[in-house]
């Protein structure tokens, strides 16, 4: 049996500061890379020059320069469509991969649509904390899986229908991994890359712009302001689009909890909200983002109020993310 081929897809925009370190960590992988596709979204710094330098030295690197700015969502979609290998690994421009990242994910993916891993997150690798996401179908109603941790089957990733328009690409891919072909997701529960948190991070900037008053270490705020934001988000077109997509594409016989919860999140009455809270409390071990915090009485309280905790600083449904050219 032949080993599957792997493509790495990276999208760049003004990433000169950390780009070399990330490229070097990809080139140092213990598993062979068939193609490294890097698509630059009209950078104004030295990013393109760095990419062209690597392209001249490494035969399997292909650099594409966009003629106009696409934004990160459409940039990743169009870049992924260029890949020809069996499996596609998604890469940010400012991470660092562990040498065995691809090898361990190739060994784990089996017949699944998607394999992801835990990762390190922080300003410095030495002080970074481990992020290990939940990935049950119902957990993906509240939070996606980081794209930079993903290894995805190409025939699945290049299906047009998994790219939910105006929504974060990696979140829609994760949900689609269950809804299409029903192959689902597998996890390597060890950190295989370091994801930098720094002042230029796009998601961080967007969050601070939308919630300038939010607390770094909140206490009561998620319970109070989270409810208000939950009701506000329910009116957003992106909210309705995403949860309608999940409800319409989830088979109730295969994913009854996912289907039921997506339906409740589309309803505005108090009874539906209480039912949703009760389900979150009951299934908190597979839904709440940090398993350790879902234990005991406090865990039950967190589980019940998780729709509000999730909504407290949720900017996903406020953003305008296009997939159309």
Residues covered by each model-derived region:
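Glycine-rich, basic loop-to-helix element that forms the pyrophosphate-binding segment
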Residues: 66-83
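A conserved acidic beta->alpha catalytic loop
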Residues: 40-49, 68
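C-terminal subregions of glycosyltransferases and related glycan-biosynthesis enzymes
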Residues: 167, 179-185, 191-325
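Cell-envelope/extracellular polymer assembly enzymes that use nucleotide-activated donors
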Residues: 4-7, 35, 172, 176
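Conserved nucleotide-sugar donor-binding catalytic segment
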Residues: 81, 135-212
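Short aromatic/hydrophobic "clamp" motif used to bind/position activated sugar donors
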Residues: 88
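Conserved donor NDP-sugar-binding/catalytic core segment of glycosyltransferases
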Residues: 100-128
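Short, well-formed alpha-helical segments that are part of the catalytic scaffolds
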Residues: 15-28
């Amino acid at each position: 049996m032949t080993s599957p081929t792997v493509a790495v897809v990276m999208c760049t925009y003004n990433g000169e500061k950390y780009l070399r370190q990330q490229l070097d960590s990809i080139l140092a992988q213990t598993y062979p890379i068939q193609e490294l596709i890097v698509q630059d979204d009209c950078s104004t710094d030295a990013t393109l020059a760095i990419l062209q330098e690597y392209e001249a030295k490494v035969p399997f690197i292909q650099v594409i320069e966009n003629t106009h700015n696409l934004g990160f969502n459409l940039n990743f979609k169009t870049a992924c469509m260029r890949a020809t290998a069996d499996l596609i690994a998604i890469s940010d421009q400012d991470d660092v991969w562990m040498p065995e990242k691809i090898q361990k994910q190739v060994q784990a993916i089996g017949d699944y649509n998607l394999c992801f891993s835990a990762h390190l997150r922080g300003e410095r690798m030495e002080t970074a904390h481990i992020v290990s996401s939940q990935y049950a179908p119902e957990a993906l109603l509240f939070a996606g899986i980081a794209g930079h941790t993903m290894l995805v089957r190409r025939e699945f990733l290049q299906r047009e229908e998994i790219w939910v328009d105006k929504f974060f690409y990696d979140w829609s891919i994760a949900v689609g991994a269950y809804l299409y072909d029903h192959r689902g997701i597998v996890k390597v529960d060890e950190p295989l890359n370091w994801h930098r948190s720094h002042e230029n991070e796009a998601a961080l900037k967007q969050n601070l712009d939308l919630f300038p008053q939010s607390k770094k270490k909140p206490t009561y705020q998620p319970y109070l302001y989270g409810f208000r934001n939950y009701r506000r988000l329910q009116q957003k077109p992106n909210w309705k689009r995403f949860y309608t997509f999940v409800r319409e594409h989830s088979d109730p016989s295969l994913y009854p909890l996912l289907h039921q919860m997506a339906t409740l999140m589309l309803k505005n009455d108090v009874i539906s909200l209480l039912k949703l809270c009760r389900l979150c409390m009951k299934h908190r071990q597979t839904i709440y983002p940090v398993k350790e915090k879902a234990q005991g009485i406090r865990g039950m309280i967190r589980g019940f109020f998780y729709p509000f905790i999730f909504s407290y600083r949720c900017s996903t449904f406020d953003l305008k993310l296009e997939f159309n050219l």
